[in-house]
Amino acid sequence: MAEEKRIISVFFVILQSLIYTVFAMDERLDKVKVQCDYLPLINFAIQQNGASIIHQLSIENTTPAPLKDIQVQITTEPTFGNAAPIAVAQIPPNESICLSSFNLTLSANYFTQLTERLSGNLKIEITSEAESVFCQTYPIDILAYDQWGGLNVLPEMLAAFITPNHTAIVPIIKRAASILGQWTDNPSLDEYQSRTPDRVRKQMAAIYTAITEQQIIYSTIPASFEEYGQRVRLADSVMAQKLGTCLDMALLYASCLEAIGLNALIIITQGRSEERRV
C-alpha cells in the first residue's frame, strides 16, 4: 500500500527536548570558563538507544598564556558510566574550544537493576600540563529502568516502551484474529497486504476489542506526568495486574499493532490521553 494511504494509530504532540546549559568557573583556579550542555536525566531507554548525555562542552582560556597538554576527564557519581580522557593539544590565550564527541560508555547492567529514581552527578575535571585548572559536578537524575522521563527530555524515548515481541501480548493477538474472523470470515492479520484501508481498520478494531475484553481497570496518572514522566507498566505488568494508566494502555495497544505489522505513532496531548487516527 502506498505510504500516504497507510492507517496509523495515533495516541498521544511531542515537544522540544530540554537540555541543561550550565556555565561554570572554578573560582579557586580562575583559568578557564566552561559551558556544559547536557541531559538533566538518564534512564535505561536512553542508554539502550545510545543517546549522548553531554551534547557540547565549551572551554575558554581566560589567561594571557596558552594552556597546553590539556586532559578532560568525565566521571559519574554513582558509577553508571565511564569515559576515556579527552586530550587537547592547547587552547590559545583568551580563546575557546568546543568539544562535541565524548566516549562515555553507560552500563546497561547498572540501569537494568535500578528500581528507584536516584540523584547523581557528572563530574568534569580539566588539567593542563598535569595541573588542575577546573573541577565541577553537574546534577543528573537517574531514573528507574521502567521510568519514562517525560516530554522535557528526549520524549521520543517513549517509543522504547513499545514491546511488540513481548510474549504477554500473544493472547491478545490470538483473540484479535478470532474476532477478525467472526467479522470478516478471514482471521488473517495481514497488515497492509490487502491494500484496503477498511481491512486495516478492522484489524485495528479487532485488537482494540481484544484488549477491552481483558477487563483492565483504569489507573489515574500522576500530576503533570507530561512534563516529568512516570513509571510505565509494560505489557506483562498490565496483563498480570489488570491495571493501566492511559499511557500504559496506549503502549499496550501500540505494541499489539506493531506485532501484527501495523505502524503505530505515539503522541502526547496536554491533559489526558486520547486515541486519534490519521
Predicted regions and their residues:
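Low-complexity, acidic Ser/Thr/Pro/Gly-rich terminal tails and inter-domain linkers that flank the onset
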Residues: 25-51, 77-79
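Short, solvent-exposed loop/turn segments enriched in Ser/Thr/Gly
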Residues: 49-56, 118-121
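Asparagine-centered strand-capping/turn motif at beta-strand->loop junctions
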Residues: 57-63
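Short acidic/proline- and small/hydrophobic-mixed sequence motifs that coincide with surface turns
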Residues: 64-69
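Intrinsically disordered, low-complexity Pro/Gly/Ser/Thr-rich segments with frequent PxxP/GP/PP motifs
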Residues: 75-115
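Terminal connector regions
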Residues: 100, 104-152
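Secondary-structure boundary elements
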Residues: 168-240
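Conserved small/polar residues in nucleotide/adenosyl-binding loops
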Residues: 276-278
